[in-house]
Amino acid sequence: MADDKDFPSADEYGRGLKGIGINLLVRDVPRSVAFAKDVLCAVAVTADKDFAVLQYRMGRSAAEWMLHADGTYHSNPMLGLLSDVSIRGAGAEIRLYDCDPDEAVARAKAGGYHVLQEPADKPHGLREAYILDPDGYCWVPGVPKRG
């Protein structure tokens, strides 16, 4: 999926993290990486069947997030919260700015992903859409609306 020979060790990577982080627990890391690459135009910095680091860069925007397979969380209390949940991330929006919603929706539809809301101009100055990934996390690509 991604060549990670230059990626730091888990300990080294973890020590370098700053600010706020997003870590999504997913059932199938390769499937979620495919969604991020195909729909959001993200790049897999490193990825295997259990873990991935994804980056998105467009214009002045940059984002990085991690994916962990459920099995990697065997000792983590979060896994217990997901046992009876069919759609993950309910109530949370993961917003990706400077990601064209019209283009993202076209890619999502081509890939068979669920578009929750078509692109629309919103009163808060953005044009955005709502797209569900394979685990039900809601991604909101958005750009400043024209005019």
Task: Indicate where each model-derived feature is located.
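Vicinal oxygen chelate
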Residues: 2-23, 43-99, 103-132, 143-147
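Short, surface-exposed ligand-recognition loops at beta-strand->loop->(often short) alpha-helix junctions
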Residues: 24-28
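Major-groove DNA-recognition helix of helix-turn-helix-type DNA-binding domains
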Residues: 40
